[in-house]
């Protein structure tokens, strides 16, 4: 008798849940942006590979904003520039939250990863700390260090062009290790701590892929014994690494020997900032995680574009010859006189965006757009790949055309933007340091070399890793020096 009662109660509960799902689906479907049909209960199947490309195809079919369902999760994907402005910028206050990320944030990161921290006081605390060290005035102080490392990048390409992607990783690691931890000696892409941090980033990227872990759709799985135990192991390994780096700075501070760094700033202001030791370690690690991964990828994309579009490369070099000449190397002081360099960088950002699929936002209130309603609680993805191919904003989007960023006077346009650093209140606080890195490396490498493809091994410009931040797969380049006595002129030897 008891078993019959229990069975009846469970059956009734299940029936009620199914009816609730059906009613919710019918109610929301009337107001949501359109989208591909899915299973009545489980919704749409997550894409197996390169979700941003799949979503771009759906944009062509369903329009600037479309809706997907994963279980009870509602996901609205934006694939056009104006829709991104209307929803994620004009409604930034209502769309700056992050959806719950159980696998990547709660299990792997103890809830401390800035990228996935929900809107609220904790996020404000984290961003205040980051902004103090990465705002434009602070970022400008890193230019001498970035310039030194950019010269080494050029010399590395001169001596060993076959490993140009590794040299980009070395540059990025050296810069962010200096900013984050005050490390002044050269950092190699093969240093153990760099390899371990990059391994952690790869694990994070895998956990962030849509549909990677069922726990993100059914959070109760988090409490099942043994579920995703490898994610907990990853967390302990990463926390041990970033804590070790932070403690090394503590020891130097205690001796009065610590150079300026973000970690030193956090330690000296820890009580005022109200951050725990674990939060401090993750904040410092965020500098490396965000800066190293994205900068290395962007440098690879820049050289790929130069090789594949020699006419665009030649335009930059003509201006470099006119403004700088070949008797000295370009510097940051030349930036205002080199709009062709800036335009080349901006087009590289657009042509192959590093954060191709973007990171999910979450609506905290209903957002009305073009007669549709994105309901509170829905996830919103600004798909950078599709937005970068908006033909109304970027005509002939598959072409690499830096000239689109210049006005009739040859100056950089103020009326054309791209959202490669994110949207609204979630824009990347490290964008100024990143822009500085891309400008000076592009200026120096195109001043120093004519970059071309290997005729025996043409570049596949769509061959990228299937990760949260995409990287070009290995490709061959030829670096032909344009400048005599390059090493002497750069005033530095390869390190």
Curated annotation (Swiss-Prot):
The keyword Zinc-finger does not apply. The chain crosses the membrane at residues 2-22. GO terms for molecular function: heme binding; iron ion binding; monooxygenase activity; oxidoreductase activity, acting on paired donors, with incorporation or reduction of molecular oxygen. Its main location: membrane. Belongs to the cytochrome P450 family. Cytochrome P450 monooxygenase that is able to use 4-ethoxybenzoic acid as a substrate for oxidation. This is Cytochrome P450 monooxygenase 88. It comes from Postia placenta (strain ATCC 44394 / Madison 698-R). The lineage of its organism: Eukaryota, Fungi, Dikarya, Basidiomycota, Agaricomycotina.
């Amino acid at each position: 008798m008891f078993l019959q009662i229990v069975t009846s109660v469970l059956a009734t509960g299940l029936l009620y849940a199914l009816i609730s799902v059906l009613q919710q689906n019918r109610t929301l479907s009337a107001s949501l942006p359109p989208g591909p049909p899915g299973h009545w209960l489980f919704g749409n199947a997550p894409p197996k590979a390169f979700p941003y490309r799949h979503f771009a195809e759906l944009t062509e079919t369903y329009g600037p904003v479309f809706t997907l369902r994963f279980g009870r999760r509602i996901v609205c994907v934006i694939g056009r520039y104006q829709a991104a402005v209307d929803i994620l910028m004009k409604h930034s206050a209502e769309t700056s939250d992050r959806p719950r990320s159980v696998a990547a944030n709660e299990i792997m990161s103890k809830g401390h990863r800035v990228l996935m921290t929900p809107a609220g006081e904790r996020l404000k605390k984290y961003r205040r700390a980051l902004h103090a060290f990465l705002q434009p005035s602070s970022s400008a102080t890193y230019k001498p260090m970035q310039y030194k490392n950019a010269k080494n990048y050029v010399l590395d390409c001169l001596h060993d062009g076959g490993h140009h992607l590794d040299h980009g990783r070395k540059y990025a690691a050296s810069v962010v290790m200096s900013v984050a931890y005050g490390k002044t000696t050269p950092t190699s892409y093969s240093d153990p701590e760099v390899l371990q941090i990059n391994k952690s980033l790869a694990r994070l990227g895998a956990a962030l892929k849509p549909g990677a872990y069922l726990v993100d759709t059914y959070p109760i799985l988090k409490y099942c014994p043994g579920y995703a135990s490898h994610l907990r192991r990853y967390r302990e390994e990463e926390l041990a690494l970033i804590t070790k780096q932070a403690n090394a700075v503590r020891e130097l501070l205690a001796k009065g020997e610590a150079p300026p760094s973000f970690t030193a700033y956090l330690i000296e202001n820890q009580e005022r900032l109200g951050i725990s030791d674990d939060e401090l370690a993750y904040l410092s690690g965020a500098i490396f995680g965000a800066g190293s991964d994205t900068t290395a990828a962007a440098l690879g994309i820049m050289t790929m574009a130069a090789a594949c579009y020699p006419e665009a490369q030649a335009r930059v070099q003509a201006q470099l010859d006119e403004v700088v000449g070949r008797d000295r190397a370009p510097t940051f002081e030349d930036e205002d006189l080199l709009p062709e360099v800036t335009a080349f960088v901006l087009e590289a950002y657009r042509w192959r965006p590093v954060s191709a699929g973007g990171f999910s936002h979450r609506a905290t209130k209903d957002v009305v757009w073009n007669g549709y309603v994105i309901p509170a609680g829905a996830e919103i993805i600004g798909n950078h790949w599709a937005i970068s191919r908006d033909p109304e904003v970027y005509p002939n989007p598959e072409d690499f055309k830096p000239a689109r960023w210049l006005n009739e006077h040859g100056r950089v346009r103020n009326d054309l933007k791209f959202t490669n650093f994110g949207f609204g209140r979630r824009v990347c606080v490290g964008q100024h340091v990143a822009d500085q890195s891309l400008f000076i490396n592009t200026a120096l490498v195109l001043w120093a070399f004519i970059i071309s493809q290997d005729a025996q091994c043409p570049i596949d410009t769509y061959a990228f890793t299937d990760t949260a931040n995409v990287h070009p797969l290995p490709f061959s380049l030829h670096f032909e020096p344009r400048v005599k006595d390059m090493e002497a002129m750069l005033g530095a030897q390869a390190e």
